[in-house]
Amino acid sequence: GESHSIGIPLAVATNDSFIVPTATMLVHPVRMNGTLLGAPQTYYQFNQMQDRIVSFISSHTKIEKDRLESLMLAKDTMAKDLGTILVGKNAVEEGLIAHVGDLQDAIESLEKKVEEKKEALKC
């Protein structure tokens, strides 16, 4: 598709994040359909877009900017594309996601945070 998948930025735009053990995350560079860049300005625009995405993701996670770019541009993971596929705990190990867990784990975490906030407001 055009530009960039929104999945990772959405997943990390939180205070806490979970991924189920079998879920995958595709870390890839900004791209468009086709293989041509028609003008230098297009290349520059794509670099700017990618830099904004990388900055957003790295500022909302524990992954370093250089490591994220390395995963995005990996050539050895997929036969006909650039990028890296991370499965469950690999996303946590890389620092993109905070925890491996399911919906129940996320709900329990949220309930705990609500209780902590209530207690803090009582003081």
What would you call each of these model-derived segments?
Residues 1-123:
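N-terminal organellar transit peptides
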